[in-house]
């Protein structure tokens, strides 16, 4: 698994560019193949969510997982290419609600923008045949089949408080081979591709920056190496409302200065002597106070 420069994903009219991707060099069933995993601390919305990512296939003709939930009962929720190179989306949870495309995706030189939009809630108003939507390069896939349609308010396995994988079915099977860029998971909202891309001047589909919220278990993976460490570095950090790692300092920092850049608020100073939960205000004369919502820990790069 490695970061690759020059993905050649064209930028949109906004000037937004995706200039790096993550390469998955998986084998069919090798436990040594690379993949990513995450386990939510608590379950999110299992009726309504959106997954968006860019994929460039590296090999064809085998089962390859994009995103999956590893269930103890083996009833995985899973999004994958099958051996005939169609896209499958299995909701999991003990029911065979499985949606698949008729088109086959067999061009290893092309980038595909994939959006999987789920809404089984009655409030969403979707027909049972339309609760699972797949979009490819901005277009909804209507040439499709299914083994069974989900019932209203059905809760699939993805977004449970259990292990999820990117690039593998369960850590032992169906490893992805290819490149992936810009993965967004939106918890609690069923979106369309226009939240992530737009049509260019020549009819091509191009990425744009996502500006919405992510919900409880949502996340954004840019798959981008965003710094180069050369000794001591000063790092500025743009928050997104979630817990994130700040790297690029080149060492384990002894002092962190946190301040708002687009809103009013106190400037908070943290140091290794007092600890990550003790802060001072640089713009006030107050004594130190205990605060756990800004800095989690001091760690080495």
Residue ranges and their predicted role:
Residues 9-11, 19-35, 39-40, 57-60, ...:
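Surface-exposed molecular-recognition determinants
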Residues 48, 67-69:
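Glycan-recognition patch characteristic of GH18 chitinases/ENGases
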Residues 48-52, 111-113:
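Intrinsic-disorder/low-complexity, polar/charged segments enriched in Ser/Thr/Lys/Arg/Asp/Glu/Gln
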Residues 121-123:
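Short glycine/acidic-enriched loop and turn motifs that connect beta-strands
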């Amino acid at each position: 698994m490695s970061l690759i420069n020059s993905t050649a994903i064209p930028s949109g009219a906004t000037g937004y560019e995706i200039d790096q991707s993550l390469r998955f060099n998986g084998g069919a069933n090798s436990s040594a193949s690379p993949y990513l995993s995450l386990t939510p601390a608590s379950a999110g919305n299992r009726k309504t969510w959106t997954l968006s990512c860019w994929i460039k296939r590296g090999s064809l003709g085998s089962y390859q997982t994009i995103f999956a939930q590893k269930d103890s009962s083996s009833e995985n929720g899973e999004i994958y290419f099958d051996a005939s190179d169609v896209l499958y989306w299995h909701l999991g949870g003990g029911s065979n609600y499985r949606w698949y495309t008729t088109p086959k995706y067999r061009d290893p030189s092309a980038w595909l923008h994939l959006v999987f939009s789920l809404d089984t809630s009655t409030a969403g108003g979707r027909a049972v045949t339309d609760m699972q939507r797949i979009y490819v390069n901005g277009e909804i896939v209507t040439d499709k089949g299914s083994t069974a349609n989900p019932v209203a308010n059905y809760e699939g396995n993805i977004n449970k408080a259990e292990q999820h994988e990117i690039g593998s079915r369960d850590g032992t099977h169906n490893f992805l081979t290819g490149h992936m860029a810009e993965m967004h998971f939106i918890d609690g909202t069923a979106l369309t591709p226009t939240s992530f891309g737009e049509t260019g001047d020549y009819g091509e589909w191009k990425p744009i920056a996502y500006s919405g919220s992510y919900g409880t278990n949502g996340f954004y993976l840019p798959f981008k190496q965003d710094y180069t460490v050369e000794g001591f570095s000063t790092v500025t950090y743009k928050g997104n409302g979630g817990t994130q790692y700040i790297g690029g300092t080149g060492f384990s920092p002894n002092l962190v200065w946190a301040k708002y850049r687009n809103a009013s608020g106190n400037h908070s100073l943290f140091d290794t002597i007092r600890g990550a939960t003790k802060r001072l205000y640089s713009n006030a004369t107050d004594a130190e106070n205990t605060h756990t919502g800004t800095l989690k820990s001091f760690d080495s790069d």
